[in-house]
């Protein structure tokens, strides 16, 4: 099962349960590269944004999602691979270089690329200082940056809560 079938099967349930909405989708190009730079409040953010955009969106995701143990670890890793998530090593310095290069490659091939400039979820719903990855992606790929705001998802799924309420 690939990105499209997962979106087609999981998407309607998410739309029915959570009724996410988007405003300004006309700013997302129908074709060609663009960087969707969003604040990050909850795990569910990475489901809602692709659900509301007509094109496939590849995201960076922490490398921990690809190294879990047991059945849950296997399921998470395979889901992340299937939806095109690029693992990023967040230990600092040049550790994230490979993930950013993979993002540049996707952008140069005309795809949408989602990234959370803060580098992690906000623990309290506030916006924190972003890292330089978005600027580097834009400068090296020539892709436009489209700002995205997630609103209220931290209330639906606080950090540590497994399933959004």
Predicted regions and their residues:
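A transmembrane-helix-recognition feature enriched in membrane-embedded lipid enzymes
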Residues: 1-23, 55, 71-83
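Short, basic, glycine/proline-bearing loop/turn elements
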Residues: 9-11, 82-90, 117-121
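Short gly/ser/thr-rich secondary-structure transition/capping motifs
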Residues: 15-23, 95-97, 151-154
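A cross-family acyltransferase "interaction/gating" segment
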Residues: 28, 112, 123-165
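Catalytic core of membrane glycerolipid acyltransferases/transacylases, capturing the structured
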Residues: 30-93
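Residue-level preference for the first positions of well-ordered beta-strands
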Residues: 33-35, 112-116
């Amino acid at each position: 099962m690939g990105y499209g079938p997962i979106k087609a099967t999981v998407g309607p349930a998410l739309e029915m349960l959570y009724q996410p909405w988007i405003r300004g989708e006309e700013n997302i190009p129908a074709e060609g590269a663009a960087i969707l730079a969003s604040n990050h409040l909850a795990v569910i953010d990475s489901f809602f944004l692709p659900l509301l955009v007509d094109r496939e969106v590849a995201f960076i995701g922490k490398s921990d999602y690809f190294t879990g143990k047991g059945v849950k670890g296997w399921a998470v890793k395979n889901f992340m691979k299937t939806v095109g998530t690029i693992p990023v090593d967040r230990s600092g310095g040049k550790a994230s270089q490979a993930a950013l290069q993979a993002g540049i490659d996707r952008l140069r091939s005309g795809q949408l690329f989602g990234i959370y400039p803060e580098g992690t979820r906000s623990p309290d719903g506030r916006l924190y200082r972003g890292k330089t990855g978005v600027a580097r992606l834009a400068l090296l790929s020539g892709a436009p940056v489209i700002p995205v705001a997630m609103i209220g998802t931290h209330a639906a799924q606080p950090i540590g809560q497994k399933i959004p309420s």
